[in-house]
A protein has these predicted regions:
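Glycosyltransferase catalytic domains, chiefly GT-A lineage
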Residues: 1-130
Length: 130
C-alpha cells in the first residue's frame, strides 16, 4: 500500500526539507564531527545536489528488494563510511543519484503513537560526538 509508485517509503522529517540546514544543525549540536559534515555538504554541492529536495526520518523504511534498492543500500553505506554517520543527510543524496523518489509514510517516526506502522520506536543514541 505504501509502495504504489516507488520502491521505497520513509517518514518525512517533521521540521526541515533540506540536508543543508540539517547539516548545520548536526554541526551546531555536535551530533558528528563538523569537518565530516562540512566535507559531505561541500561534496554534495559540487555534485549539484539541489536544496530543499527532501529530508526524512529514518529509524525505519519500507522497501522492495530490487537491484536498485540493493544498490541504494550499498551507496548509502558508502556515504556513511566516507562522511557523517548521520544517515538522514546521505539518504536523500543517494536516492537522487539513483532516481528514487521515496513515498512518504503517514505520521511521525520518533514519537510514541505517532504512526500506525510502528506504534513505538525505541531510540538509540548512535551519535559520534565532535
Amino acid at each position: 500500500k505504501y509502495l504504489n509508485d516507488t520502491d521505497v517509503a520513509v517518514f518525512k522529517h517533521p521540521e526541515r526539507d533540506c540536508i543543508y540546514p540539517e547539516g548545520k544543525i548536526v554541526m551546531d549540536i555536535k551530533f558528528d564531527h563538523p569537518n565530516l559534515v562540512e566535507d559531505q555538504l561541500a561534496f554534495y554541492k559540487d555534485m549539484c545536489y539541489p536544496e530543499h529536495n527532501g529530508l526524512y526520518e529514518l529509524p525505519v523504511r519500507v522497501q522492495r528488494n530490487t537491484p536498485t534498492t540493493q544498490r541504494m543500500g550499498w551507496m548509502w553505506w558508502e556515504q556513511i563510511c566516507m562522511f557523517s554517520s548521520r544517515d538522514q543527510i546521505s539518504f536523500p543524496f543517494v536516492c537522487n543519484q539513483l532516481g528514487i523518489k521515496p513515498s512518504i509514510l503517514p505520521g511521525r517516526a520518533n514519537t510514541i503513537r505517532g504512526n500506525d506502522i510502528m506504534p513505538q520506536l525505541v531510540y538509540s543514541n548512535h551519535n559520534r560526538k565532535a
